[in-house]
Design a protein with these regions (language model features):
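Transmembrane alpha-helices
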Residues: 1-148, 176, 210, 220, ...
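USP/UBP deubiquitinase core
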Residues: 136-203
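Beta-sandwich strand segments
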Residues: 206-208
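Non-catalytic accessory segments adjacent to catalytic cores
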Residues: 214-216
Length: 348
């Protein structure tokens, strides 16, 4: 039986590796093409190539569910077309045992993806964005809003060295505007923020008063480590960062839905991958030997895209209709498991 596990695993590992190389290669060529404009604007090919290479861990992590799905269809499909699965069944090996062998083989990729997505991809993606910022000459983040009590703060951008640019603070009391402060930059020095080149405007006896200052200590709870979170898409963050920033947003009275959605999607990705593999197994055993490799790949791509599309729709819908993001990402997984179980039962 141990030899059976190894034999099935070799077929699946080889198929998944080939599928990953094909998908990743196509995606990297597309990404390189989208960055060619930067070469015309003075960037070197080395800088662009460095950026592309640094995004590889993130791309591998994102493609892993689809890659494993298609790889299992190809690997198991090859065994089915050679009647090897039929021979295994005739030798007394149960369908459940074959499914278990496949799941063990896939677990290697699931574990690798989890480690990659939590410890490698967030770091390399941040480095990639810094590299892109340097050769494009743009700020490392787009504008973002913060809230501190009655203060509403807008930061237009953050440089790669963590310096805030164009900080605007609007202070309200009882829904009435009290004061506006605009600073050219904000720097974290020691253990506090310092605003520089600032102007403060307020209303006094129906007269607008304006005062300028060179610098001012800014008492705000925003920590420098949160800036790296703000500069990245929630989908690219580590689970620890998602939890930390979600808590900060809740404490500030701001919407944390995008980060909560990304948290649950990341937590459930291993289960999502395994559920797609279950669908792949059921499709192979539930179909005839005449199914071609192209048909299996097409089915795998369609199922993977449909699964991802449903998750992307249900995720934001959970915020609109008020149900938990956990349910939004869990429902497609349960549907895949139920559908796979039904097809396997029909296959005997």
């Amino acid at each position: 039986v141990r030899l059976l596990d190894i034999y099935i695993a070799r077929h699946i590992w080889a198929a998944v590796a080939i599928v990953l190389l094909v998908i990743l290669g196509l995606d990297l060529m597309t990404a390189l093409g989208s960055e060619l404009d930067a070469l015309d604007n003075g960037a070197s090919f080395k800088q662009v190539l460095t950026y592309i290479v640094l995004t590889v861990p993130r791309r591998v992590y994102e493609f892993m569910p689809l890659t494993v799905l298609v790889g299992c269809l190809v690997g198991l499909g090859a065994l089915a077309n050679n009647s090897e699965l039929t021979v295994m069944r005739a030798a007394g090996i149960s369908l459940r045992r074959i499914v278990w062998s496949v799941m063990q083989a896939v677990a290697v990729f699931v574990l690798a993806a989890a480690i990659l997505g939590e410890f490698v991809a967030p770091v390399s993606q941040k480095m990639a964005e810094i590299e892109q910022t340097q050769y494009k000459g743009a700020a490392s983040t787009k504008g973002f809003w913060l809230r501190e009590g009655n203060d509403y703060i807008f930061v237009r951008s953050v440089k790669s060295d963590g310096v805030l640019q164009d900080v605007s603070r609007y202070r309200f009391a009882d829904n009435n505007w009290q004061q506006t402060l605009v600073a050219k930059t904000g720097e974290y020095q020691g253990s506090q923020w310092t605003l520089k080149q600032l102007q403060t405007v307020w209303l006094e006896d129906q007269i607008i008063v304006q005062q300028g200052q060179d610098d001012m200590v800014w008492p705000v709870s925003l920590k420098p480590n949160l800036l790296s979170i703000l500069s990245m898409d929630p989908q690219h963050l580590a689970i620890e960062d998602l939890v930390e920033y979600s808590e900060y947003l809740h404490q500030s009275g701001l919407d944390a839905a995008p980060y909560e959605l990304a948290f649950w999607k990341k937590i459930l990705q291993p289960l999502a991958t395994l559920s797609l593999v279950f669908v792949a197994i059921s499709f192979v055993f539930g179909s005839t030997r005449s199914v071609t490799l192209g048909q299996r790949v097409l089915v795998g791509v369609l199922v993977g895209l449909a699964f991802n599309y449903v998750q992307e729709v249900l995720g934001p819908a959970s915020s609109v209709f008020g149900f938990t993001p956990l349910l939004a990402y869990l429902m497609p997984i349960l549907v895949c498991v139920a559908g796979g179980a039904w097809m396997l039962r029909k296959a005997g």
